[in-house]
């Protein structure tokens, strides 16, 4: 006799998962391995996702935290800088060591770097809204001399900070912050420093905003909201917070289906599901399959917008063909993001 499975609605958010910057960064490592052979070194996790990192390691990537960890015998092999960006000192160190490097910094993070440098060029002290210790924050602060940037993490920081010249200030933000929380910090800073200069363009990236909007729209009425992402993924953790604030009874961050605590979930009838910008779609599929094994699942697409952005890879590797098979370890065999457009503009 077939076991009865209770009904379950899964609200599958769209957009979700990989953004254009993450796609580009992973593809840079894949293409470098195809062109130059293993090993390809990567400074820091290329993106904050264990599954992605392990998949690239299996293909010949070696992850290091500092360039000094690269053996002398492999100094002729390429090193890739992560999507989060690096301080100016890192490429300078690579050049001093005669290393060939490929910079996989997200173009939107690079834009924040340029905005910060523009503030300084115009004589402003730079305020960076972000989380201390995050690689993106370290990279942005490292674009300017010591003392040229002040990090603000909370509204309380914004309320208590002081500057020598309060009329010459400019701010930028980490790209992966909560839109709502950042708005509160900016409001407090603007109230205290009326001449505070904003960046020429929004610092929080389109993908962060889009994923938060989709979760916010889907969360009301959800018994549980699952976000696929790593514990060190800033944008994924923000999605958990957004789901809770928007009305989900419970929200969880999981890296794989095996992380779901079924006993803790209890009785549920509506589940929201999304993924951080560094989480692969193949894990979303895995989690849906885990629910299908326990419930009679009906999937409702909770889509708020459609993303079409694509970023070109580095010129040095545009002559290498990227195939569906190359990216199947993160996208699955049925889904490829950006490959057809990636190679345009050679």
Swiss-Prot record:
Residues the entry annotates as binding (2E)-4-hydroxy-3-methylbut-2-enyl diphosphate: 48, 84, 134, 175, 233-235, 278
Binding note for cofactor: Binds 1 [4Fe-4S] cluster per subunit.
Sequence positions that bind [4Fe-4S] cluster: 19, 106, 205
Co-factor(s): [4Fe-4S] cluster
Annotated catalytic residues: 136
A molecular-function term among this protein's GO annotations: 4 iron, 4 sulfur cluster binding
Positions of isopentenyl diphosphate binding: 48, 84, 134, 233-235, 278
Binding residues annotated for dimethylallyl diphosphate, in chain numbering: 48, 84, 134, 233-235, 278
UniProt xrefs under Gene3D superfamilies: 3.40.50.11270, 4-hydroxy-3-methylbut-2-enyl diphosphate reductase, catalytic domain (3.40.1010.20)
Keyword Oxidoreductase (UniProt): yes
EC nos: 1.17.7.4
NCBIfam families, alphabetized: ispH_lytB, PRK01045.1-4
Protein name: 4-hydroxy-3-methylbut-2-enyl diphosphate reductase
Source organism of this protein record: Brucella melitensis biotype 1 (strain ATCC 23456 / CCUG 17765 / NCTC 10094 / 16M)
């Amino acid at each position: 006799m077939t076991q009865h499975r209770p009904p379950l609605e899964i609200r599958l958010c769209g957009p979700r998962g990989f953004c254009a910057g993450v796609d580009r960064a992973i593809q840079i490592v894949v293409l470098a391995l195809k062109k130059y052979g293993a090993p390809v070194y990567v400074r820091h996790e290329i993106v904050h996702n264990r599954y992605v990192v392990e998949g690239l390691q299996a293909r010949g990537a070696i992850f290091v935290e500092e360039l000094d960890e690269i053996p002398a015998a492999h100094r002729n092999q390429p090193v890739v800088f992560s999507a989060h960006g690096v301080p100016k000192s890192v490429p300078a160190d690579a050049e001093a060591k005669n290393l060939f490097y490929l910079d996989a910094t997200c173009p939107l993070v690079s834009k924040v770097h340029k905005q910060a440098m523009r503030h300084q060029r115009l004589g402003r002290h730079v305020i960076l809204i972000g989380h201390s210790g995050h690689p993106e924050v370290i990279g942005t602060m490292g674009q300017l001399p010591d003392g040229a940037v002040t990090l603000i993490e909370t509204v309380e920081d914004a309320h208590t900070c002081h500057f020598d010249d309060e009329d010459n200030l400019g701010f930028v933000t980490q790209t992966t912050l909560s839109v709502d929380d950042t708005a509160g910090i900016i409001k407090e800073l603007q109230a205290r420093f009326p001449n505070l200069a904003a960046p020429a363009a929004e610092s929080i990236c389109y993908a962060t905003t889009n994923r938060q909007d989709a979760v916010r729209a889907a969360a009301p009425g959800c018994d549980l909201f699952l976000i696929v992402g790593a514990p060190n993924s800033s944008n994924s953790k923000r999605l958990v917070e957004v789901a809770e604030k928007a009305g989900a009874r419970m929200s969880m961050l999981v890296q794989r289906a095996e992380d779901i605590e079924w006993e803790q979930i209890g009785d549920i009838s509506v589940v929201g599901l999304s993924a951080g910008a560094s989480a692969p779609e193949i894990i979303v599929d895995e989690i849906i399959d885990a629910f299908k094994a326990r419930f009679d699942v009906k999937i409702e697409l909770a889509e708020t917008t459609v993303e079409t952005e694509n970023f070109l890879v580095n010129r040095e590797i545009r002559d290498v063909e990227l195939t569906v098979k190359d990216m199947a370890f993160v996208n699955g065999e049925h889904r490829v993001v950006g490959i057809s457009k990636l190679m345009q503009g050679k």
